[in-house]
């Protein structure tokens, strides 16, 4: 007769826990599943050192994830894995996506992965989650992106302190906004694109003004409110502050646009602080699942993911990379550009959208119809997820939409969805 002592019992207890976690493992299959977007939620976008600056990216991520799961109408333990984009990770502690996931109240057995594809991080998270769902590795996942540019630290090289003092580098610039191959700011790449495609300062200013106008109209009409989850800021003894609206689009003076100096090229430059995106804080999350899981859970999806693609060009040409990803999408889906009702091309700079509209020869009236990053803000790890989620909310049944976003290093990602 076997005797079960304390050590044996401990081993059995550990084994039982291990077995309990195995339901979140991966199993592949031969046929691909259809993947749907069950919900999409995002925080408001805060200005740099603005309304959301007291919260780290991981907390913003938790808020977005929790809201997305609640709006999907499913129990949290149905989520079997989480991917979250996050670019400027320095100083946040280990595994930002894990922090965001547990902070959202999801099960401790939920695996997580943090994705860094610079500005395309949030969108790439959606693409990777969709792949996992298509292949049957998981049935329900959360994907999104988060960034708090207000909380990004400075750094200095390790080693002996040199004579004459130390040099601090801004991680926002070093890891987020610098072309490492040409050793200059991404804005210089934007200037290069403007010169190559003959896009003027006036065109960029006009586009930026239109972005602000469209964002205001979208907010005034209540169109954006459906995707927002409010953020409560504790004031330690004073009444809490509740942030429930994007901050950036209201901070504009159109009379100053033409008077601003160019930032990256003094002579014959075109890019200014007004026609480029800003530094911001925010997070977005989507619940993705197989069509089978949606049926089992009685979920009515917002949209289905039809196709997705990446592209890469010379690093200096990163602004035009979406124009190389989009044709892959259309070819894979068997669609023409005329079939696309809505385009979301991330406004890292006004010239990015103008360049891609020109290269793809698409109708500008269908592009960024509710504004974009120039006016709403660009928390770089969040933006790719934000534009996919926005499309999922505002497209009409049966319409197709394409979201595309460029990223530093010469890359781009793009996603094609159909509204259900």
UniProtKB/Swiss-Prot annotation:
Catalysed reaction, written as an equation: 2 acetyl-CoA = acetoacetyl-CoA + CoA; propanoyl-CoA + acetyl-CoA = 2-methyl-3-oxobutanoyl-CoA + CoA
Places the protein is found: Mitochondrion
Record-listed E.C. numbers: 2.3.1.9
A molecular-function term among this protein's GO annotations: acetyl-CoA C-acetyltransferase activity
GO cellular component: mitochondrion
Signal peptide region: none
Transit peptide location: 1-33
GO biological process: fatty acid beta-oxidation
Top-rank lineage group of the source organism: Eukaryota
Cited SUPFAM superfamilies: Thiolase-like
Biological pathway: Lipid metabolism; fatty acid beta-oxidation
Pfam (any one): Thiolase_N
Residues annotated as binding CoA: 212, 251-253, 256, 277
Function: This is one of the enzymes that catalyzes the last step of the mitochondrial beta-oxidation pathway, an aerobic process breaking down fatty acids into acetyl-CoA. Using free coenzyme A/CoA, catalyzes the thiolytic cleavage of medium- to long-chain 3-oxoacyl-CoAs into acetyl-CoA and a fatty acyl-CoA shortened by two carbon atoms. The activity of the enzyme is reversible and it can also catalyze the condensation of two acetyl-CoA molecules into acetoacetyl-CoA. Thereby, it plays a major role in ketone body metabolism.
Subunit-level organization: Homotetramer.
Protein known as: Acetyl-CoA acetyltransferase, mitochondrial
Organism: Xenopus tropicalis (Western clawed frog)
